[in-house]
Structure formats: C-alpha cells, structure tokens
C-alpha cells in the first residue's frame, strides 16, 4: 500500500499535537517515551510490519496504540479512498477482562471526545467487546427457565439475578447468577434457524451491531482471537469481522493462551456434559456404556500414577493403562458410528475429541506432551499439550500479512526479544521490528534496591529457610513502618512464614491465597498493612501511592519443573543452553512483573528487596537479575532503607 509522504508527515504531526497539546489540556502529562512509541507504532501499522514493543511501567501504551490506530485509518482512507479494505476494523486482543472494559468504557470515550472536539476526527470512535456465545442469554431459554422456577423455592439472590437477565443480555454483568442457571439460559452452541424469538433475539442484535461497518474497534481476549484464527485456517465461518490490523496487548500471555487453546484434555466433567446432552434425546445403553467405560479409564490411569493437586505429572504407559485406553477407544468408535447421523454436529465433535485424547495417550503421540493433573475434587484429568504452538501462531496470525503490534511491559528479557519471538512463532518472520520504550519513572531517585549480603544458604522449603526469611522480612517491615507487599513463589513457604510473624509484627497482616480479591481490597483500605501474596499478585494488581512502599521478593521466580518443561529441555544440546534460552528468560519476565508492583505513578517511592542469595552480588544469577531490572540506587544495609523512607515520606505516612 502506498502512502504519500505528505500524508505520513501530517499523521506524525497530529501525534505530536494530540500528546503535547490536547492531552495536557485535559490534565495529562507529556511523556516523551509515549510519543515516540506512538510514532513507532504508526509507522509499523502503515508498513504492515509486526512490531514488538516493550513498554515500561507508566508509558501509557494504551493511548499510544489507540492514537496510532485512529490515525492509520484516517490517513489510509485519505490516501486510498473508501476501499473495502481500508474500512475494515482493527482488533485489540488482551488477556484481562479489566483491561478490555477499561479500553471500551474509559480510554476510547475520552480519546473520541477530545479528537472530535479538536476536529481530528468527524465521528465518534465505535468499539465493541467480542466474546463467545456462552457469555450471552438466549431469550427463548431464559423464558423457559423462568417458568420452570416459578413454583420452586429458589435462592432469593439467584432468582433475582436470573430475572435481571431480562434487562442484561451479557451474563458477565450480573452478579449471583448460579453456574447451573448460566448453563441453562446461555445461547446454545447451534441456534435453530426457526427459533420463534430469532427476530427479536438480543444476541443476534449484538452480532449485527458488531458487524456494522462503523464499528472501528473489536476488542476480545487472546483465546477468542486464536479461535477466530483457527476458524479461518479450517475455512470455517470467522468469529471476528475481517480486520486490517491487530493489536495484541499483554502479549506475553499470548503463548499461554495458545497452549490452552491447542491443548486437549479429558476429565469427568467432560463425560458428564456429553452424557447430559445425549441423555436428553437418546436414552439407551450407549450412554451408560460411554459413562462407565471412560470413567473406568480415568480411574485406572489415576491408580497407576501418583498425582497431586496443582502439580503436573508425566504420563507413563502401563499394560493396564493400555488395555483400558484401547477399550475406551473401541467404545467411542461404536457410539460415534451408531449415533453419527442422529446427533447434532457439535455433540459429534465432542465425542470425536474424546476419542482423540484417548488415542493420543494410547499411541503416545509425539506431537503432544502427555501429562496428568487433578481437578478441584482430586480427580484425574488427561492433558495433551501441543508441541507446535509457534507454528500454529504463525499460520493463524502472522502469515496473513497484516500490520500488528505486540506490546507488554515484559516482552524483552535480558538483552533482547529472542525468547518471545520463539514463543510466538516470529523467530523466522522477516517483517518483525523491535522497539523498547523505557519507563518514564525516575527509578534512580524514587526506588531503592536491596540485595542482602548476609543471606544464609538453606535447604529449600526447610524450617531453617522459613525462619531465616521470616527474620529478614520482620526487619524490613519494621524499617518501612508496614506499607509492605511480600511476594512468594510458594504458598507453602508463605504459610509457614506468615504463621511465624503473625503475632510478631506490630502492623495489620493479610495473607492472600488463591482467588481472594476481597483480601486485596481490605489491604488497600488500610494505611500501613502488610500483604503476603503469591500467584496473580505478581502482575495483575495495582498498589499506587504509599500503600506499597516496600516490596519484598522472597525468591527469584523460577518456574517449577513439569512434563512440559522437561519436553522442552530435550530440544537443546545441553542443560546450560536450555537454562539460558528458556529458564532464565522466563524468570526475568516474572521478576519484571513483580518489580512492576513497586512504582505505579511518577510520584511513588519504594524499597525493593530480593531475599534470594542467587540474586546478590557474586550470586549465580546476579547479572541476569540486574539486567532485568531498571537502574536503581543500591542499599548496603537496613540503615540505608530507613534513611530512604525518612527522606521521602511525610508525617502522614506514619499515622
């Protein structure tokens, strides 16, 4: 596509006007790094390149890519006219629902308003969040469900939630809706063409709005983006309207979404779901045979392996496992052959997927890493993780030739982008450009890094280690008068240390386990509390201001070995090569995510301590740690920390 030099110059001048004039008029700071990032993004979108943009904390990358997209469309329409291609929307894919909602309800309305007021654009920017039909209400099924519960003594909150769906067709907007009600009223996998409510169906109206030619931005999560790509690859009907450019925010999560998307699994709930749908139409011995045989397969495999909740276990074939897997495959063959022409396509697909998983395990298919894990009820799940994720991403996304921006605060690891390029299938793609936008925050002034020199080497997960760590944490908390976030990589170690300190610390202490958002909210409402956390708190939670003035990273966040990483290791010539190519970059990415909790605004000040002897001067991974983090002043001892806090905090901090 050809753009005149004049149009390019005008587009770049408008970037400067937007960020240097319009945004400051509405109370936003001028950030040179943000402006340069936007220029880079625009050039790559117009040139149909794929840009890997590592954007440091506080850059404002969301406005950077939104402005770039708006100007790309404006000037490509001026240059090429109103061709069908130029009028195609752009897609923004993110990992988190929170960011999707913020883009739709905060970023886009603000940007649209000020650009219209200025005359940069003539019409509002229209956007929609796209997601699977299981999130939406089927009006026909809702009506049937309401009738079914009229005479029943249903939980009042759940009943109120169900009735509220008359006003809200997006079930994610409704609280207290039971999982069973959600399944009973959601849009079915295949809608009947002669549905009596099709003409007034709110879901169909939502789809029509999404396809409107004025709908410039389609927002979705990574899984939906990949599902659309898979549909296109298989010549199925696409989920998204044809688009001309792609923005992947939180791009470091794209490989994980692809692993989930292209991995296969089989568990008890899968069989129960299939039998439930078959049982509604086909009562007979086939259903009992299906349920009994597959449950027995899962039971036998579970008995032949020692599995623990939360731990992936490698699958090992035994004679007994082989016998029951073979029987399961034969049972599936007979059921599929008998019911093939009597059942809907989606149920047949479910049966075929079940058979496929059994075949992967029986034949020990080398295209997959075969492993086992437990569900919440400690029942076995068969898992097959694809070894071809990079190739799938290339085929579904990058080979289509459109411009794309992949951005995140943790794309770069160590000295470059080689790790993320390999993970996302971009290793051999020539049109990739790399760009680093450093954080505008003054880390040298506002952040103090402490790597204790007196850390004792202890056996991992031992009582001695927990006591040593507890002692250091106690000293640090008292030095900063609370206001502390302690990040663990192990829930077991976190629990031990918490029990040791709960009665020793003169500040409120909160321990966050899995799925405990209410505890995080409680911490934010306190003035000088201490939060012990692990898991998602490494990356998805914001603590601006003084609430986190001390961040303690207990251990370097190395991934726990599992069957998938063991399979990866075999691809490298030596263990050292594998550690440097995979293990260290993964650790650096997670470390940067955790470190990012320290400063969330330009005025934040924080002490960051890492209590892992491998990170300290002379430690095994000292250079890798320093390479991953921004340049900060170093603390020699606790006195330096106390001095830093006293000099940067006001009287109200201690109240």
Which role does the model predict for each range below?
Residues 2-24, 29, 76-218, 222-223, ...:
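A substrate-engagement module of RecA-like helicase motors
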Residues 47-67:
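Walker A/P-loop
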Residues 65-67, 71, 98-101, 105-111, ...:
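Signature of the SF2 helicase/ATPase Hel1-core->accessory helical subdomain module
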Residues 88-98, 405-409, 482-489, 610-611:
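Conserved RecA-like ASCE P-loop NTPase motor core of nucleic-acid helicases/translocases
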Residues 189-216, 229-237, 335-453, 465, ...:
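A contiguous, basic/glycine-rich beta-loop/short-helix subdomain that forms a polymer-engagement track
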Residues 395, 454-489:
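Conserved interdomain hinge at the start of the Helicase C-terminal
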Residues 452-464, 515-616:
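Conserved RecA-like P-loop NTPase helicase motor core
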Residues 489-513:
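Conserved helicase motor "Helicase C" RecA-like lobe of SF1/SF2 P-loop NTPases
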């Amino acid at each position: 596509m050809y753009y005149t030099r004049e149009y390019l110059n005008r587009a770049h001048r408008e970037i400067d006007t937007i960020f240097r004039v319009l945004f400051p008029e509405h109370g936003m700071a001028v950030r040179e790094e943000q402006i340069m990032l936007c220029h880079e993004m625009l050039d790559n979108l117009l040139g149909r390149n794929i840009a890997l943009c590592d954007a440091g904390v506080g850059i404002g990358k969301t406005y950077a890519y939104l402005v770039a997209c708006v100007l790309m469309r404006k000037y490509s329409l001026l240059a090429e006219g109103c061709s069908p291609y130029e009028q195609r929307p752009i897609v923004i894919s993110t990992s988190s629902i929170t960011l999707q909602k913020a883009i739709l309800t905060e970023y886009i309305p603000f940007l649209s308003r000020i650009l219209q007021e200025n005359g940069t654009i003539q019409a509002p920017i229209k956007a929609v969040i796209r997601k699977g039909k299981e999130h939406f209400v089927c009006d026909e099924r809702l009506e049937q469900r309401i009738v079914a519960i009229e005479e029943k003594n249903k939980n009042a909150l759940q009943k109120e939630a169900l009735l509220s769906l008359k006003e809200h067709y997006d079930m994610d907007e409704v609280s207290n809706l039971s999982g069973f009600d959600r399944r009973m009223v959601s849009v079915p996998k295949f809608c009947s063409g002669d549905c009596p409510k099709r003409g007034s169906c709110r879901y169909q109206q939502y789809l029509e709005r999404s396809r409107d030619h004025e709908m410039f931005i389609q927002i979705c999560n990574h899984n939906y983006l990949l599902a659309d790509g898979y549909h296109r690859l298989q010549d199925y009907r696409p989920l998204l309207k044809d688009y001309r450019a792609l923005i992947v925010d939180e791009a470091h999560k794209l490989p994980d979404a692809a692993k989930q998307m292209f991995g296969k699994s089989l568990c008890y709930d899968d069989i129960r779901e299939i039998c439930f749908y078959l049982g509604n139409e086909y009562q007979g011995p086939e259903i009992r045979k299906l349920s009994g045989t597959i449950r027995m397969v899962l039971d036998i495999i579970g008995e032949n392996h020692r599995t623990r909740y939360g731990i992936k276990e490698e699958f090992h074939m035994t004679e007994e496992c082989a016998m029951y897997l073979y029987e399961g495959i034969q049972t599936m063959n007979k059921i599929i052959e008998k019911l093939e022409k009597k059942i809907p396509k989606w149920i047949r697909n479910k049966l075929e997927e079940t058979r496929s998983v059994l075949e992967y395990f029986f034949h020990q298919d080398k295209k997959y890493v075969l492993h086992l894990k437990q569900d919440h009820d400690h029942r076995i799940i068969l898992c097959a993780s694809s070894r071809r994720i990079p190739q799938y991403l290339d085929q579904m996304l990058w080979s289509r030739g459109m411009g794309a921006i992949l951005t995140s605060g943790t794309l770069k690891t160590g000295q470059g982008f080689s790790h993320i390029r390999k993970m996302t299938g971009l290793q051999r793609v020539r049109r990739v450009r790399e760009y680093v936008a450093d954080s505008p925050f003054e880390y040298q002034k506002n952040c103090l890094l402490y790597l204790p020199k007196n850390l004792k080497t202890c056996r991992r997960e031992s009582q001695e280690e927990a006591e040593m760590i507890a002692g250091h944490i106690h000293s640090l908390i008292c030095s900063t008068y609370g206001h502390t976030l302690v990040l663990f990589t192990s829930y077991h170690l976190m629990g031990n240390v918490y029990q040791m300190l709960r009665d020793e610390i003169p500040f409120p202490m909160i321990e966050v386990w899995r799925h405990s958002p209410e505890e995080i909210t409680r911490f934010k409402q306190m003035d000088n509390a201490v939060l012990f956390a692990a898991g998602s708190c490494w990356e998805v939670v914001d603590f601006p201001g003084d609430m986190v003035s001390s961040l303690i990273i207990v251990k370097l966040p190395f991934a726990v070995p599992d069957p998938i990483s063991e399979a990866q290791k075999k691809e490298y010539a030596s263990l050292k090569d594998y550690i440097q190519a995979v293990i260290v970059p993964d650790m650096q990415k997670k470390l940067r995510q955790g470190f990012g909790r320290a400063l969330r605004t330009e005025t934040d000040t924080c002490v960051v301590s890492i209590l892992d002897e491998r990170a300290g001067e002379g430690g095994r991974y000292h250079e890798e740690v320093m390479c991953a983090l921004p340049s900060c002043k170093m603390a020699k001892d606790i006195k330096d920390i106390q001095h830093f806090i006293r000099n940067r905090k006001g009287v109200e901090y201690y109240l």
